[in-house]
């Protein structure tokens, strides 16, 4: 009985303080995050590390939603940085296979994105230079990896679903992350390895199956009422 009372008190405490929960680090919508990134670059506060949090494979997303990448490519500042912005990483085994067939220094034609989840986004055509290849990298579950120049953005593409938090993934492809101005990782909160590099970091509220704003996800069998969908609901432990 004492244990049950403790559980009830804890549950009631969570409920009573629900409006106080928030992200613990800098969190922004996509367009705002890109604007702030350009401010940081201009001020020399680099590297800036952005978390593509809505498509976080370590939380169960598909690692192939390209919507945020498309915004970056369309930005004339962020798509022309030197050294280039590095985006780590997209799951697309067909594109990786094509990159290995083309070889380093050559051009690969194909599509990027929506290799697994064709609902959250759609593929974009790419005509990309193959900058570097890495076969069966042990740090990413022996995934093959390719570094592609996609319209001025260095994009890491993997043959397997992998966690995108380790800067060693970039180093395996010849990229020195400490020297970059902007890094984007498909991740939520930054892991210590990548956080140690960042001079400024932002969690970006991007699209995907791990969208941090739960009300933006589609639910088919959600019992109602349910918080935060029904803000005015009442509940008692």
Name each model-derived stretch.
Residues 1-152, 156-157:
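Hard-cation-handling environments
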Residues 15-18, 135-237:
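Extended hydrophobic packing segments that form well-structured cores
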């Amino acid at each position: 009985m004492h244990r049950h009372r403790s559980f009830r008190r804890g549950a009631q405490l969570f409920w009573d303080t629900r409006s106080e929960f928030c992200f613990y680090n800098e969190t922004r919508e996509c367009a705002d995050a890109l604007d702030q990134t350009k401010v940081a670059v201009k001020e020399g506060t680099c590297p800036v590390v952005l978390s593509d949090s809505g498509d976080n494979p370590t939380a169960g997303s598909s690692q192939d939603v390209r919507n945020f990448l498309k915004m970056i490519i369309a930005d004339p500042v962020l798509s022309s940085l030197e050294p280039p912005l590095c985006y780590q990483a997209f799951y697309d085994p067909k594109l990786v296979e094509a990159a290995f067939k083309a070889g380093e220094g050559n051009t690969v034609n194909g599509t990027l994105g929506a290799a697994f989840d064709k609902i959250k986004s759609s593929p974009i055509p790419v005509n990309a230079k193959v900058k570097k290849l890495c076969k069966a990298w042990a740090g990413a579950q022996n995934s093959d990896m390719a570094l592609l120049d996609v319209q001025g953005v260095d994009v890491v593409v993997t043959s397997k679903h992998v966690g995108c938090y380790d800067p060693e993934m970039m180093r395996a492809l010849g990229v020195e992350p400490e020297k970059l101005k902007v890094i984007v990782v498909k991740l939520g909160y930054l892991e210590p390895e990548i956080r140690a590099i960042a001079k400024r970091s932002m969690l970006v509220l991007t699209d995907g199956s791990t969208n941090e704003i739960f009300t933006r996800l589609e639910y088919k069998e959600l019992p109602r009422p349910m918080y935060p969908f029904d803000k005015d609901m009442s509940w008692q432990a």
